[in-house]
């Protein structure tokens, strides 16, 4: 996996998972954990959300990070600085409790750095993990796209041109 793709996946916060159900396109946002060519998502075994991600289902996953808003002196040249990844892969259910525990702990550390069991929260019990679905999406193909830099409109460098051009952190 190219470093840039891994960097973007490790930095992202929300993954939008797209799939086709009964001939209709669908997408669902998830917190996720990326590790070694796999995107992991978890949720309640009783909820229907993860049931649709059955073993072998093909999915597309999109992760995007907005870094800056880029204003131009020309309306059609307003843009953004961003990093994004689209991956294609297949879903696999994880039933091993030790792996579920490890991925759940890694996901918690990713979104809540510095929180640890037992001082900050109770660890997941085997019963908790049994009631939790964990799906691994094995990445088969991935593409990254990014933009960085300042305004690039036709008059953005001209001091006397009307309007303002700037970069605002998101």
Please give the residue ranges for each predicted region.
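Short, basic/aromatic recognition patches
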Residues: 1-16
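Short beta-strand segments
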Residues: 12-45, 61, 75-77
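Short helix-to-loop capping/linker segments positioned immediately adjacent to catalytic or ligand/cofactor-binding
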Residues: 16-21, 49, 74, 91-96, ...
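A structural signal for short, well-ordered beta-strand segments
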Residues: 32, 89-91, 139
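Structural motif
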Residues: 38, 58, 90, 141-143
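Short, structured beta-strand-loop surface elements
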Residues: 45-106
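C-terminal edge-of-domain segments
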Residues: 95-170
């Amino acid at each position: 996996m190219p470093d840039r793709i891994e960097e973007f996946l490790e930095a992202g916060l929300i993954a939008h998972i797209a799939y086709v159900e009964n001939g209709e396109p669908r997408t669902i946002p998830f917190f996720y954990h990326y590790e070694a060519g796999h995107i992991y998502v978890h949720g309640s075994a009783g909820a229907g959300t993860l049931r649709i991600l059955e073993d072998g289902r093909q999915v597309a996953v999109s992760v995007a990070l907005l870094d800056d808003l880029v204003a131009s002196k020309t309306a059609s040249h307003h843009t953004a600085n961003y990093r994004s990844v689209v991956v294609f892969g297949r879903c696999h259910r994880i039933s091993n409790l030790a792996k579920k525990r490890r991925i759940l702990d890694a996901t918690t550390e990713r979104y809540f750095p510095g929180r640890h069991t037992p001082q900050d929260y109770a660890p997941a019990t085997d019963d908790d993990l049994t009631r939790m679905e964990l799906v691994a999406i094995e990445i088969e193909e991935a593409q990254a796209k990014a933009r960085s830099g300042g305004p690039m409109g036709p008059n953005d460098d001209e001091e006397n041109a009307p309007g303002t051009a700037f970069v605002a952190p998101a």
